[in-house]
Regions:
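Glycine-rich flavin
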Residues: 37, 41-44, 51-124
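Alpha-helical interface subdomain recognition
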Residues: 2-69
């Protein structure tokens, strides 16, 4: 994350500015089956993955509605980009239950990105 994290408004502005680029790259992204590394890196540098991350690790702690507007705007360019950013954003949710030292260790490397899934672990 960054020392001065972009706000949700900053990310929304950048997402809007990048819609056409994302649309133009969508077919190549789909064919590759993954985000191009330069795109993943720039999304990280622009603060997208840290929208819900705690501020003590450089996250924006954005309200859910603001983050979802960012995701919606990215999806207007390329839904797969929006999906990847959404996974990165939601993967930061459990960080609030970790100690400050653990969070700092996870984000010791600039541009750290998380990915994961939530699934029910109980039985009915």
């Amino acid at each position: 994350m960054t020392a001065n994290p972009p706000s949700a408004e900053d990310c929304l502005r950048v997402a809007s500015e990048r819609r056409e680029e994302l649309y133009d790259r969508a077919a190549a992204t789909e064919a590759a089956g993954r985000l191009p590394e330069d795109l993943a890196e720039s999304l990280s540098a622009e603060g997208f993955y840290g929208l819900w991350a705690p501020s003590d690790v450089g996250g924006a702690e954005a309200p859910a509605a603001d983050a979802m507007r960012v995701i919606e705007t990215l999806a207007e360019g390329d839904a797969s980009v929006a999906w990847c950013v959404f996974i990165g954003i939601t993967s930061t949710l459990p960080l609030s239950s970790l100690s400050e030292n653990a969070r700092r260790e996870i984000f010791a490397s600039p541009g750290a990105r998380l990915a994961g899934v939530f699934e029910p672990s109980g039985t009915a």
